[in-house]
UniProtKB/Swiss-Prot annotation:
Recorded name of the encoding gene: mgsA
GO cellular component entries: cytosol
Pfam families, per database record: MGS
Enzyme Commission identifier(s): 4.2.3.3
Keyword line: Cytoplasm, Lyase
Quaternary structure and interacting proteins, as annotated: Homohexamer.
SMART domains: MGS
Name listed for the protein in its UniProt record: Methylglyoxal synthase
Compartment(s) of residence: Cytoplasm
Coiled coil (UniProt feature): none
Residues bound to substrate: H19, K23, T45, G46, T47, T48, S65, G66, H98
EC class (word): lyase
């Protein structure tokens, strides 16, 4: 597939997602990094977003809860270029009914080449990166060329 460049803006659109057993871990991470996160636009699945907003007072664009389609909503935003970073603390020790949605969300984040953290250490690396508050170019699939090739 041919690639093109997308610029992640200095003010990032960050999706925050956590499975039930990981919500407290994400909450602690968000509270620790609140001064930095407040400079960006936050999205989250339903329960997680409401918990973050209630605990911190930050504005969070809450989707539906993950099992009700929230993971797919976040995935759609990623494919539309509206999410720049995904922080997703998923529980590797417990299966969830919407596992296919989880896999699809991670697949879309990979396809569209956005930074993804699935644990605290990686989330810390991303948010502490010297480029976190900078505009950054990434390579993404050239969908228009892909579509044109498919329609030949």
């Amino acid at each position: 597939m041919e690639l093109t460049t997308r610029t992640l803006p200095a003010r990032k659109h960050i999706a925050l997602v956590a499975h039930d057993h990981c919500k407290q871990m994400l909450m602690s991470w968000v509270e620790r990094h609140q001064p930095l996160l407040e400079q960006h636009v936050l999205y989250a699945t339903g329960t997680t977003g409401n918990l973050i907003s209630r605990a911190t007072g930050m504005n969070v664009n809450a989707m539906l809860s993950g099992p009700m389609g929230g993971d797919q909503q976040v995935g759609a935003l990623i494919s539309e270029g509206k999410i720049d970073v995904l922080i997703f603390f998923w529980d590797p020790l417990n299966a969830v009914p919407h596992d296919p949605d989880v896999k699809a969300l991670l697949r879309l984040a990979t396809v569209w080449n956005i930074p993804v953290a699935t644990n605290v250490a990686t989330a810390d690396f991303i948010i502490q990166s010297p480029h976190f508050n900078d505009a950054v170019d990434i390579l993404i699939p050239d969908y228009q060329r892909y579509l044109a090739d498919r329609l030949k």
